Regions:
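Secretory/extracellular carbohydrate-interaction modules
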Residues: 311-375
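Short, aromatic/His-centered strand-loop micro-motif at the edge of beta-sheets
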Residues: 376-399
Length: 452
C-alpha cells in the first residue's frame, strides 16, 4: 500500500484534474514542464497520465488544448473531468489577458476531445472579470448538468467579493443561471469550487485564496438553501491545495496539489507546484466528512507490539524501529491519561543529535500538528497551517496511520489528515514519546514494504 501520490518524472505540476474510469486513474495536468516550480499557470494545454497505481503510468501529450485564439498568451485554470455513461466530460477556464472563457469538452476515450467555448451571462452584481475555475456535476434527479464557477461581486478591490455561482443545462450546450450558490463575504477570491452529493447531503468544496490556502467544504441537506459549517471545515492541512473530488467505485475521493517549498528551504513559502495527493472520503451520520487512505491495510493484525510511556514531570520516549528506510506504513492504537500535556510519533529521528520530524498531539488545545523537533534554532521549519482540530479524550483509544514516502508523510487520525513535506533526513528511527503524562500504544504494525 502506497501513499496515493502522483508526480511525473523530473517535473512538478499544478492545475490538475483527475477522474477514475475502468480501474484506472486519468490525471490531466499542466503541460508547461519547462517553467520554474514556483511559477503558476501559463500552460497551453493538458497532458494526460493514465495509471492503475499512481506509480507506473503512460503519458499522452497535450490531449486538451486552449480554445482561445492562436497567438495570444493564455492561462488555463483547472476544472474537472466527469465520467457519464461511458463518456468523458470536462470543463476548465482559459484566460487571455482580461478575458475569461469557460471551455467544455467531450471524449469517448479521455484522449481525443471535442472542445467548445461556452457562453455564460453573469448576474448584474458580479464583476465580468473572473477566473471561473469551473466544475461539472450531473444531477440524476433533475437529469441536468450543473456547472459551478468562481466569481467576484462588484465592489472595492480590497473588499471580500468572492462568491460561487451555479448554472444548469439539459443538453451540455445552453447554460442558464440556477442560483448564487454561496456568497460568504469572507474571501477576496474563492478558487476551485466543486459541488457534489452523497445521499441526502449536498457538499460545496473550495480553496481559499489566502496565506494558508487550504481546501474547505460546507454541507447542506437537499432542499435547503443555506450552507452550514461542519465541526472541522478542512479534511487536510496546508499541504493540500487547489483540488477537487472524483468518484471511484462508488465512493468519493479528495485530491489536490501537495506543494514543494520555494527557495528549496523549509523556511520558504509553499509553491503552487508539486505532485497530486489523494484521500478517500467517508461520510459520517451527521453529514460531516472524514478521510482515510485510498488503500486499506491488507492484514488486520492486533497485539503485534505494544508499549507504555510515562513521565509526569518531563519527557519519556522510546525508539520503536531503528532502520525504517524511507518508505513505510505504521498503524497503531493510542491512548493517553488525563492531564497528559503532549505526545506523538517521530519520523526520520536521530536520537544521537535529538533531531527529526514529528506528528504531535496536544490534548489541552485539542489539536494534532506536524513539526520539526526541536524546531530551533528559532526556527528551522515553517509549519503554519499544518495542524488539525482533533477530539482528544483521555482514556479513549484512537486508531492512527502514518505513511512515509521519501520526502512526503501523511497522518490519518480522527477522520482528518495532515500531509507534509520533509526536505532533510536527520535519521532513520521511528520513535514514540510523551511529555508530562502517560501514553499507551498498542497493536503496532510497521510495514517497511508498504510503499514500493
Amino acid at each position: 500500500m502506497q501513499i496515493s501520490y502522483f508526480q511525473p518524472k523530473d517535473t512538478y505540476i499544478n492545475q490538475v484534474m483527475m477522474c477514475f474510469y475502468n480501474e484506472k486513474y486519468y490525471i490531466y495536468y499542466q503541460c508547461d514542464d519547462t517553467r520554474l516550480p514556483q511559477d503558476a499557470g501559463g500552460s497551453q494545454g493538458w497532458n494526460l497520465a493514465v495509471t492503475e497505481d499512481l506509480e507506473h503510468y503512460e503519458v499522452h501529450q497535450m490531449v486538451l488544448k486552449s480554445a482561445a485564439e492562436v497567438g495570444r498568451r493564455k492561462t488555463l485554470r483547472a476544472g474537472n473531468v466527469v465520467i457519464r455513461e461511458e463518456r468523458f466530460y470536462a470543463c476548465y477556464s482559459v484566460q487571455a489577458g482580461t478575458d475569461t472563457q469557460i471551455v467544455t469538452a467531450v471524449s469517448e476515450d479521455g484522449i481525443h476531445w471535442t472542445v467548445a467555448v461556452q457562453q455564460f451571462v453573469l448576474p448584474p452584481e458580479c464583476d465580468d472579470k473572473f477566473e471561473a475555475m469551473p466544475s461539472l456535476f450531473y444531477e440524476k434527479e433533475t437529469k441536468k448538468w450543473l456547472l459551478t464557477v468562481s466569481a467576484e461581486k462588484k465592489g472595492p478591490e480590497a473588499a471580500y467579493r468572492g462568491c460561487i455561482l451555479q448554472y444548469q443545462s439539459g443538453d451540455f450546450t445552453t447554460w442558464i443561471e440556477r442560483e448564487m450558490l454561496w456568497s460568504p463575504m469572507r474571501y477576496e477570491k474563492i478558487e476551485r469550487p466543486a459541488f457534489f452529493t452523497i445521499g441526502k447531503w449536498q457538499y460545496l468544496l473550495y480553496s481559499e485564496h489566502c496565506d494558508e490556502g487550504k481546501i474547505h467544504y460546507r454541507k447542506r441537506q437537499k432542499g435547503e438553501t443555506g450552507w452550514s459549517a461542519p465541526r472541522r471545515g478542512c479534511l487536510d492541512g496546508r499541504c493540500l491545495e487547489m483540488g477537487g473530488v472524483f468518484s471511484e467505485n462508488g465512493h468519493w475521493c479528495l485530491y489536490g496539489i501537495l506543494p514543494i517549498r520555494k527557495m528549496n528551504s523549509e523556511l520558504g513559502d509553499w509553491s503552487d507546484c508539486g505532485g497530486v495527493l489523494v484521500h478517500r472520503i467517508v461520510q459520517q451520520e451527521n453529514g460531516d466528512l472524514s478521510v482515510l487512505p485510498i488503500e486499506e491495510k491488507e492484514t488486520q493484525l492486533s497485539g503485534v507490539s505494544a508499549l507504555t510511556l510515562e513521565n509526569i514531570q518531563g519527557n519519556a520516549e522510546l525508539v520503536f524501529a531503528k532502520q525504517t528506510g524511507t518508505r513505510y506504513r505504521v498503524d497503531f492504537m493510542m491512548e493517553f491519561s488525563e492531564l497528559t500535556y503532549r505526545f506523538g510519533v517521530k519520523i526520520y529521528e536521530n536520537s544521537a543529535i535529538d533531531s527529526g520530524y514529528a506528528y504531535q498531539f496536544v490534548p489541552g488545545e485539542q489539536k494534532a500538528e506536524f513539526d520539526r523537533l526541536p524546531n530551533m534554532k528559532w526556527f528551522i521549519y515553517l509549519n503554519k497551517g499544518m495542524a488539525q482540530s482533533v477530539s482528544l479524550i483521555p482514556g479513549k483509544k484512537y486508531p492512527v496511520t502514518v505513511l512515509v514516502q521519501d520526502d512526503i508523510s501523511v497522518l490519518y487520525v480522527d477522520g482528518v489528515a495532515i500531509s507534509a513535506r520533509m526536505k532533510e533526513k536527520p535519521g532513520d528511527e521511528l520513535k514514540f514519546y510523551v511529555e508530562s503524562g502517560k501514553l499507551a500504544v498498542s497493536e503496532i504494525t510497521l510495514d517497511r514494504e508498504a510503499v514500493k
